[in-house]
């Protein structure tokens, strides 16, 4: 079984890939199941009702307004795709929640507002204190130790206080935006172990994000060392996702990454249904 559990579409501000086109291409590529995981990052992007009331509230990125998922269109569109491609492709409904400790309440409200719609959610830390990693705002004025530890400290806070998530997304994402060079996993081993123990205790998991290859990273995301730590702590829930935003990303490198997971000692991966993990042999 081939599944891609980190897929963006036209409903993410950084993708223009139509839902039906994603599904059609997945079938061509021999993918059995996908889960749409479009972006929501409260206080970074406005919701569509906020944007319609005041277009100036949306930041402009690469010439386009940056807005959260259009919820009222998102869920019906995915449901229609699920019916349209039934028998050829299993289509699941998810989102990638870019949570910060001070926005947990808004994500609780969003999840409860659409109760019954969710198969899967990714908990990602994309910002701390509304400061972004991708543009270096969070790193500015901090030492390499400070911004790396600050990232993991925020992840721990959120993982402890927020419950509506399935897996931790790209666990060591901060590496992608670290211009100071390699920072040893050993420096964060204790706090990452605490994060992973919290996930395991809550019945949550982590993802292997295959975008490490297209970003030119020298290791997996999360790293081989952190994946081994998760395994050694007893972690079993593990999804694999391409973090696709464009056609060329969809399903990329997943078969190879499954072999890497076997080498590390994993024997299973997960898909999700109604927020519950389903285990499959690697």
Predicted features along the sequence, with ranges:
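Residues that line or immediately flank small-molecule/substrate-binding pockets and catalytic motifs
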Residues: 38-39, 125, 172, 273
């Amino acid at each position: 079984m081939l599944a891609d559990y980190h897929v963006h579409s036209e409903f993410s501000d950084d993708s223009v890939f139509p839902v039906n086109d994603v599904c059609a291409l997945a079938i061509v590529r021999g993918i059995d199941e996908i889960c749409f995981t479009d972006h929501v990052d409260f206080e970074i992007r406005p919701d569509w009702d906020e944007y319609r009331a005041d277009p100036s509230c949306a930041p402009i990125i690469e010439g386009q307004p940056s807005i959260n998922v259009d919820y009222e269109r998102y869920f019906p569109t995915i449901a229609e795709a699920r019916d349209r491609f039934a028998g050829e492709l299993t289509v699941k409904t998810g989102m990638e929640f870019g949570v910060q400790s001070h926005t947990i309440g808004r994500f609780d409200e969003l999840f409860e507002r659409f109760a019954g719609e969710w198969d899967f959610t990714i908990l990602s830390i994309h910002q701390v204190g509304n400061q972004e990693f991708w543009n270096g705002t969070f790193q500015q004025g901090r030492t390499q130790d400070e911004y790396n530890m600050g990232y993991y400290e925020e992840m721990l806070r959120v993982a402890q206080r927020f419950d509506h998530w399935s897996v931790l997304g790209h666990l060591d994402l901060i590496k992608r935006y670290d211009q100071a060079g390699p920072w040893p996993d050993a420096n964060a081993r204790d706090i990452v172990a605490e994060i992973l123990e919290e996930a395991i205790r809550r019945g949550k998991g982590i993802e292997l994000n295959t975008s490490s290859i297209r970003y030119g990273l020298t290791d997996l995301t999360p790293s081989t060392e952190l994946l081994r730590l998760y395994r050694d702590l007893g972690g079993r829930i593990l999804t694999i996702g391409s973090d696709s935003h464009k056609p060329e990303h969809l399903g990329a490198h997943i078969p190879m990454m499954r072999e890497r997971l076997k080498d590390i000692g994993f024997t299973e991966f997960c898909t999700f249904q109604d927020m519950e993990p389903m285990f499959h042999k690697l």
